[in-house]
Amino acid sequence: MGDILDYNTTALFICDPQKYYLDRVGGIDVIVRNIKCLIDSCKELEIKTFMTKHNPSIYDEIIEELEPSNHPVFEKTLYSMYTKDLKKNIDELYNSNVRDPTNYLRTVILAGFETHVCIIQTALDLIREGYTVHVITDATASIDSLEYTASLKRLKQSGVYLTTTEAVLFQLLRDDANPKSSKIIDLITNRSISLPSYYKEDEYGVQITHSKSN
C-alpha cells in the first residue's frame, strides 16, 4: 500500500539530536546536515516540527546547528518521543481542527537518534495511535551499525515507510510548479554531501555507515 505525503497533514519529529552523539557516530556531519535540511525545508513548507532531548544531564544539549528557532523542544527520559507533554501539544494544535481536512495530523516524518532505541519506540507508539510513519534512513543513526540495520528491519516489519531526506522532500513538493520548489531544491542541493565518503548501499538503499570502525 502506498502513501503519498501531504504537507497539510504531516509533522516532522526530530528525536534527541544531542551533542553526546557528535564523537560517537560515524558520518555524524552528514546526518546533521540532513536533519538540518529537513528542519529548514519543513519550516519553508509550514510543516510543524517537534523536537525532544533525552536526559540532557547525560546526553548533553541540542547540537548547535539544530537548535530550534520556532518549534518546541520536549525534555524526556522515556525511550519514545511520544510523551504526555508532546501528545498534549499535538492535541492542542490539531484536535480543535479535527473536522478540517487540511489541518489534522495524519503522517509523521521521523529522524534523529538512536534508531534502535528512541526512534523505533517512537515509531511503534505512533503506529499504535493510528499515524503513518516515515523514518528517514539517512537522517537517523545508532552508535552501533548492527543495531541500526537490525532496527530498520524491525521498522519495516511494523509497517513503517523507510525513505531518505531527498525523497521525502520531493514527495512533499509533488510538483515543480509548487512556489516553494526552488527554495526546497536549493536546501537539498546545498547539503554538500560527498556520497562515496559516507554512504553504502544494501537492501534498504543508500544508508550512512555509522560505526567508527567501519
Swiss-Prot record:
SS bond partners: none
Gene3D superfamilies in the cross-refs: Isochorismatase-like
InterPro entries: Isochorismatase-like_dom, Isochorismatase-like_sf, Isochorismatase_domain
Family: Belongs to the isochorismatase family.
Protein name, per record: Isochorismatase family protein 2B
Organism: Dictyostelium discoideum (Social amoeba)
Biological classification of the source: Eukaryota, Amoebozoa, Evosea, Eumycetozoa, Dictyostelia
